[in-house]
Structure formats: structure tokens, C-alpha cells
């Protein structure tokens, strides 16, 4: 299966493909390849290159350098900041960051009553429900003027995977994902 996937990626890379919005047009992440029990680096790298070639706007910068706030503005983004092990695992990091130096914003995508998201929203300086559309979500995150954007997970679902291609803060990083 892995050899077929890698061969298919090489064939597709030679085609002249164009995507306007990979979240809508592809709508899937590559999370399940982590179960192949092999090194995913080259496959991930080739897939990312394919997406960037087919949709150059994915990698655009949507932020400027430091906005000049007195506190460092840190954002955490994940669809999993709800009753999920990812949300439970990283809630404490958001909750206990020193507020005298750091302004914390949490981003997720689903509205609705969720006790964990409600707790996270109370424990951070700002909580934002992002629209389930790639372009609008990018703009909304960039508009907050973050210094650092932290993805708690990348690849578990397609929207955060495709969001992670864009520069939405001067510093971007990812945590361990699914504990």
C-alpha cells in the first residue's frame, strides 16, 4: 500500500494539477499513513510539495512581524479542543501560562455545548470559533496578530492540516498531537 501511495504521488506530481481550496476539493488528511509502521518523512514531504504546487496560495504569509503588544500573543488551534484526549492533554498548558507575560487565544471550529471547550474558553484570554472554511479561518487567525501559533495536532483532520501550510504568525509550531 505504501509503495502504491508513493508511486501515485510521483505520478500526480508530474501532472499539471490545480486546486483552489484543497480543504473543499480534497477534504481528507493523510493521518492514517501513520499506521503504516514506516518512516513517513519523505511521503509527507512529497505530499506537501504536491499541494503547494497545485495550490500556491496555501503557503502564503498572512501575518506581519511583531505587532508591538506588551504581552506575547500565543494562539492554540485544533478541532480537538473539545471532549477529546488532545483537548484534555493540552488544556493545562493553555490554562497555566503566565498571564503577566502571555496573552492566550484558543481556536477551534465547532460550536455547541462542550464542557471541555467551555472550560478552555474560561481559562484563556480569548476563545474563537473559526469558520469551517480554509480562507476565512486563515484570515480570522491572522487578524488576531499572534506572535506564536501552536497547533496541538496537525493531520488528524484536514482543516488544520491545510491551515498549517500558511504563515499565520511569525513563529509557528506543533505539539505532539494525539497523546
Go through the PLM ranges and name each one:
Residues 1-179:
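Alpha-helical solenoid repeat scaffolds of the TPR/TPR-like class and their adjacent stem/linker regions
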Amino acid at each position: 500500500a505504501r509503495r502504491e501511495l508513493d508511486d501515485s504521488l510521483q505520478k500526480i506530481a508530474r501532472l499539471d494539477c490545480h486546486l483552489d481550496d484543497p480543504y473543499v476539493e480534497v477534504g481528507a488528511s493523510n493521518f492514517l499513513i501513520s499506521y503504516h509502521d514506516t518512516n513517513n518523512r519523505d511521503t509527507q514531504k512529497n505530499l506537501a510539495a504536491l499541494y503547494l504546487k497545485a495550490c500556491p496560495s496555501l503557503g502564503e504569509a498572512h501575518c506581519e512581524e511583531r505587532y508591538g503588544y506588551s504581552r506575547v500573543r500565543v494562539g492554540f488551534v485544533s478541532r480537538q479542543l473539545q471532549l477529546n484526549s488532545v483537548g484534555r492533554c493540552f488544556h493545562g498548558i493553555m490554562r497555566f501560562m503566565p498571564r503577566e507575560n502571555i496573552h492566550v487565544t484558543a481556536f477551534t471550529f465547532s460550536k455547541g455545548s462542550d464542557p471541555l471547550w467551555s472550560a478552555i474558553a474560561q481559562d484563556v484570554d480569548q476563545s474563537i470559533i473559526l469558520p469551517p472554511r480554509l480562507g476565512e479561518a486563515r484570515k480570522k487567525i491572522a487578524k488576531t496578530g499572534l506572535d506564536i501559533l501552536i497547533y496541538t495536532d496537525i493531520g488528524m483532520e484536514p482543516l488544520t492540516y491545510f491551515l498549517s501550510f500558511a504563515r499565520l504568525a511569525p513563529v509557528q509550531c506543533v505539539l505532539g498531537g494525539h497523546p
